[in-house]
A protein has these predicted regions:
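Conserved active-site neighborhood of enzyme catalytic/cofactor-binding cores
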Residues: 313
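Beta-rich carbohydrate-recognition and catalytic domains
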Residues: 25-115, 119-185, 193-248, 256-307, ...
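N-terminal secretory signal peptides and thylakoid transit peptides that target proteins
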Residues: 1-18
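Beta-strand-rich binding-surface signature
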Residues: 189
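C-terminal segment of classical bacterial N-terminal signal peptides
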Residues: 21-22
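Predominantly extracellular/luminal carbohydrate-interaction, adhesion, and secreted-enzyme modules
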Residues: 310
């Protein structure tokens, strides 16, 4: 999900303290990607009437048939739609157009539809190939009930495709009103993992529909992709204590297997309005301990990510980790929101 103008009014934030787990219970050195490319690899078109006219956001990167692909969320003033881009080297990207459009005739997809994840290999250092089920690729999406930028209480659903270009979005399977108090305000970015015959649907959610609110990350499970059970121990990635770097948001999960453990990449938002990417690790898919420090921090004034460096998507290639994220800065007094990347090895 994204930070809009209302969510930047942090002067109104009280010193609310939600359940927190301590930092520093894991070592994130092997997951570090300190070498930023320093520019956007995917940008808004700036062309009025185009689906990506105002911003591109929310990357999900994978490999397929010998190439790399990225789904991304585009905003045109009405709502989100989902685009696809391709690359041979994870740096030079070409947009291929819209793959999941809003549908004015649909009560669910009328204003927006944002594909956040497609079921892929679990391994962090795997090629990141997709995992078809019954001849279809499985994706998970988020939608919002009103026109505008993430307006209203979001919901999550499952979508299917045979070719990655045309998607059939089924009705939502997770709704905020069916959840606990921490998620009653609306659901955000989904992440779908299959392990030992069980599907795990990770998502972040907010406790109030209207600002101010807090966001945390939880998980639901299913065998059939239809009947989902929320984990009793949610949220599995809660907000940190007052003064921490994820005091306000702990959001946008990207969950991958790192050997015998799981890595839960996510972004945190602090009370000053700074958004950064972090990671937690755990022995299974329902327990996570936060690692100390940011994996991707904001850059200095004038840099591509001087305002926000958030919303992780991680893939490995030739032994290197590539950490894609939404980079936000100000250019000529206007927000420049696009996709950038950092990796584990220097670029030169």
């Amino acid at each position: 999900m994204s930070i809009d103008l209302t969510r930047r009014e942090f002067a109104t934030i009280g010193a609310l303290a939600l359940g927190a787990r301590s930092w520093g219970q894991c070592n994130a050195d092997r997951l570090a990607t300190p070498y930023k490319l320093g520019r956007q690899v995917l940008s808004a078109s700036g062309q009025q009437g185009q689906f990506d006219s105002l911003s591109v956001d929310g990357p999900f990167v994978f490999s397929h048939e010998g190439r790399f692909y990225m789904t991304f969320i585009a905003f045109d003033g009405t709502g989100y739609q989902t685009g696809l881009a391709s690359s041979a080297n994870l740096v030079d990207w070409k947009k291929e157009g819209v793959i999941l459009k809003r549908d004015p005739s649909s009560p669910t997809l009328r204003y927006s539809v944002a594909l956040g994840w497609i079921l892929r290999e679990n391994g962090l250092y795997s090629p990141g190939k997709l995992k078809p089920v019954d001849g279809h690729f499985l994706g998970v999406y988020q939608v919002y009930p009103s026109q505008g930028y993430e307006i209203g209480a979001g919901m999550i659903g499952v979508a299917r495709s045979k070719d990655l270009r045309q998607w059939d979005a089924a009705p939502p399977v997770l709704r905020p009103e069916d959840g606990a108090e921490w998620e009653r305000g609306g659901l955000y970015k989904p992440c779908l993992v299959e392990s030992e015959g069980t599907y795990y649907l990770f998502y972040n959610a907010k406790n109030h529909t209207d600002w101010p609110w807090r966001e945390q990350t939880g998980v639901a499970t299913a065998k059939d992709l239809k009947s989902w059970t929320r984990f009793a121990g949610n949220p599995i990635i809660p907000n940190g204590p007052p003064g921490s770097m994820d005091e306000i948001f702990a959001s946008d999960p990207c969950v991958l297997q790192d050997g015998s453990r799981w890595a839960f990449f996510y972004y945190g938002l602090d009370a000053k309005g700074v958004a950064r990417d972090f990671v937690a690790t755990g022995p299974d898919l329902t327990h996570a301990s936060k690692c100390a420090g940011a994996l991707i921090d904001v850059g200095p004034p004038g840099s591509v990510d001087s305002e926000y460096a958030h919303k992780p998507s991680v893939i490995a290639w030739k032994g290197d980790l590539y950490h894609f994220y939404c980079a936000v800065s100000q250019v000529n007094g206007k927000e420049a929101r696009g996709i950038s990347v950092a990796r584990s090895r220097p670029w030169n």
